[in-house]
Amino acid sequence: MKKIVLPLLLAAFSMAAHAAGCAKPRNAFDQVYCSSTQFSQSDRDLNQEYDRVKQALHPAEQATLKHGQLAWLSQRDARCSLEKDEGYFVNLECATDMTQQRIAFLRERERECSSTGCVDAKLGE
């Protein structure tokens, strides 16, 4: 039992210390790490919500949703990233904010589809 508890306590402590570090990043690398972690979580949430909405739709509506999602991804990437000779630059705050807005949009579509029916034009946005 002691062999299990100690690693769990160490893991919990390191996660708590890391979480506190994200509240007040010490330098640019900490900020990039924290922003990246936040974006990754938002991206996972987005994928879950997209799948939830998609499962509730008929095939034609799924195609419309996919078209809208791909267009949105292109828009997010164009707005929040830049390609230069040195490589790619991504504004993670921009990407996270846009992703959170998209999650809210998809949740609205999910509520709409389950209550009054889907509006195809909105699915394609």
Regions found by a protein language model. Name each.
Residues 12-17:
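N-terminal signal peptide c-region/cleavage motif recognized by signal peptidases
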Residues 18-125:
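N-terminal alpha-helical modules
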